[in-house]
Amino acid sequence: MLSKLARLQTVAGLGLGVHSSVASATSVATKKTVQGPPSSDYIFERESKYGAHNYHPLPVALERGKGIYVWDVEGRKYFDFLSAYSAVNQGHCHPKIVDALKSQVDKLTLTSRAFYNNVLGEYEEYVTKLFNYHKVLPMNTGVEAGETACKLARKWGYTVKGIPKYKAKIVFAAGNFWGRTLSAISSSTDPTSYDGFGPFMPGFEIIPYNDLPALERALQDPNVAAFMVEPIQGEAGVVVPDPGYLVGVRELCTQHQVLFIADEIQTGLARTGRWLAIDHENVRPDIVLLGKALSGGLYPVSAVLCDDEIMLTIKPGEHGSTYGGNPLGCRVAIAALEVLEEENLAENAEKMGIILRNELMKLPSDVVTTVRGKGLLNAIVIRETKDCDAWKVCLRLRDNGLLAKPTHGDIIRFAPPLVIKEDEILEAVEIINKTILSF
């Protein structure tokens, strides 16, 4: 297990940095077109001039989305193979979710938690029964859910497990990603996330992912309150653990009285072919984190699910959010979950994912070295040369009508909305194949 300080020293020695082949977008026009809507170039320049430079977007300016497709401001149509990092599992602007938002937006949108509202309880009952937990704590963003889970784990550690006050530890897996707050980057092994932002959160330890012996060693420490892990690591490049890993995590956490926190923000809600990715191994974590597709991409909604022994350790006034549990977000989340159920999107993700991976396996191995994933959360690894890398492949995919984004330099994630059909998968694969063969 490495502390943040030890990891910083190691990384400093390695001299790791941002993928060197990522180039700046071509210089853009400086003036808006005299007539008509803004051009893509104008939009690129305006964001660059007035917005913080904390993202490096693929140069495409979108204005509309429907189902599995998006259109740019010039009217060009694209397959969306990112799905806003799996936030639009139900497809862009799903009519049922849009209607739910419209039905609520002119009634009541925000009360804060100072008062009750008539939608929160309906949502809480639905989501807890759906996932079989006693309680839900509603938040807004995925990273807020992660922060909430860490607070719950520490409070449980002190009040239930009996860890000495302020000595609780939480263990994370190397390669994890759950956000950009100070807590989240304190658990990160990615220097792009944490370098230059210390000092870091105490009591966070990191072990290798997919390594049960390392977890067993870490849990020997009686002050460990929780182990937080992604069932499949998304931002790390769709890293799928060995069969039995999650079962082993459950057994070790139970044995050592440690909470098993499953970060299902990206992997959950039908993305991997099951309601939750942990369902592939039929394990029940102590805490489950949901977000992204919990609103179908219409509104920021996240949730922390657990049983009373954990949830009720936090008392009134000890945690909260002005927007968490607001009636608009709750109404949207109910509709988003109903769409997943009614349209059997987990089953479709399972079937379409098999087809997609089978087709991706046919790509030339001198360019694509690895294909991996579950359901419709997939990735390919690009063999880098002076003429070919993941960024260049994504630019050419864009030119050919498909949007995807590199992660960790040589990896491209393919995660279309779960409403995609077989003929659409095959059409998209034709674009991918054509693009790869052009290098």
Swiss-Prot record:
Catalyzed chemical reaction(s): L-ornithine + 2-oxoglutarate = L-glutamate 5-semialdehyde + L-glutamate
Entry keyword Transit peptide: yes
Residues carrying N6-succinyllysine: 102, 107, 362, 405
Pathway(s): Amino-acid biosynthesis; L-proline biosynthesis; L-glutamate 5-semialdehyde from L-ornithine: step 1/1
GO molecular function, one term: ornithine aminotransferase activity
Residue(s) carrying N6-acetyllysine: 49, 66, 107, 362, 386, 392, 405, 421
Domain of life: Eukaryota
This enzyme's EC code(s): 2.6.1.13
Organelle targeting peptide span: 1-25
Cofactor(s), names only, from the UniProt record: pyridoxal 5'-phosphate
Any one Gene Ontology BP term: L-proline biosynthetic process
Keywords: Acetylation, Aminotransferase, Mitochondrion, Pyridoxal phosphate, Transferase, Transit peptide
Top enzyme category: transferase
GO cellular component: cytoplasm; mitochondrial matrix
Cellular compartment(s): Mitochondrion matrix
Subunit structure: Homohexamer.
Function per UniProt: Catalyzes the reversible interconversion of L-ornithine and 2-oxoglutarate to L-glutamate semialdehyde and L-glutamate.
Name listed for the protein in its UniProt record: Ornithine aminotransferase, mitochondrial
Gene name as annotated: OAT
